Amino acid sequence: SIYELRGANILCEMRFNKPYGKQSQDASSTGYLVKKGVHPSSDCQQSGQTGLLVKYPFPLIRLAELYLNYAEALNEYEGEASHSKIIPYLDKIRERAGIPALLKSWSKARYPKTSFTKDEMREIIHRERMIELSFEGHRMWDVRRWKIARQEFDQDVKGWDVSGQSVEEFYNVSGDMAQPQIVADRNFPNEKYALWPISITEIQKNRNLVQTDGW
């Protein structure tokens, strides 16, 4: 991973025998690091143990989220008839991120498409939202709202072999393919976890309240 901090590029190599590898105190368990949210004026290499951490107000809502909310609402309400209105808003987000427009990307897909069903557009919007708003505190709520929490969370966490010292070991290279490995077991044992229980204190206050199913 390369971080641009205070005008300098910092290369964070994650193999075991490297400074940011598993042997260090704060190493990544997956071999991945998150650049999003790191202020470019921060400096992890400045003298002293703590470095320089620049704090700033966390954006609770962004224009991109409003575009995504609008796109999702249009698709659910109007279906395919709304897609000519939805795509320009998704393209605004893509343009800002420096990636090709939606239809241009799909024209180069393995199975190219120029139009989508309501269900297909829903999947596209879900994916665009997951990518654009990643690490901003939305994902947990989105998968519950869409009722796909078990589908998304009932699977193991995969990453690179952080014990590997060579490139081949780290990326678990087999032939010409890198093979991520399981780094953590994760399961979603029951659908009840998609919803919060009502506090017993609140139920005691009002006996007419009915506890959430499963709790």
Where are the predicted features?
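Acidic/polar-rich alpha-helix caps and helix-coil junctions
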Residues: 1-215
